[in-house]
UniProtKB/Swiss-Prot annotation:
Record protein name field: Iron-sulfur cluster insertion protein ErpA
Any GO MF annotation of the entry: 2 iron, 2 sulfur cluster binding
Name of the coding gene: erpA
Keyword Iron: yes
Ligand binding (iron-sulfur cluster): 42, 106, 108
GO cellular component: cytosol
GO biological process entries: iron-sulfur cluster assembly
Cofactor: iron-sulfur cluster
Description of how the protein assembles with itself and partners: Homodimer.
Pfam families tied to this protein: Fe-S_biosyn
InterPro entries: FeS_biogenesis, FeS_cluster_insertion, FeS_cluster_insertion_CS, FeS_cluster_insertion_RrpA, HesB-like_dom_sf
Cofactor: how bound: Binds 1 iron-sulfur cluster per subunit.
Amino acid sequence: MENAFKSHLQFTEKAIKKIKNLIEIEKNHDLKLRIYINGGGCSGFQYQFIFDTSINEDDIIITQSEVSLIIDPISLQYLYGGQIDYLENLEGSKFIVYNPNAKNTCGCGSSFSI
């Protein structure tokens, strides 16, 4: 299922630029960013990001500015209305999620609770 959920999870321009850059470095234009939720972290759930070329039957693909995100339906329900950004600062660089569904978020921003 592609783009039916585009308005439910979006990328910032910084995230799009970084994803495109990483795909260029890998020289594999079939790569898509997969986000999924795992149990763990200090707040109960953790965001996980990987580049992937395989798409499962129930995966949802969201494409924005020629960048594709793969997400499974269960993870999407936790991220509904969210935004993926890319942050660079003195502490390092990482993809982060602005999640309107999170009741609590840990200080590093990589885990949350609902």
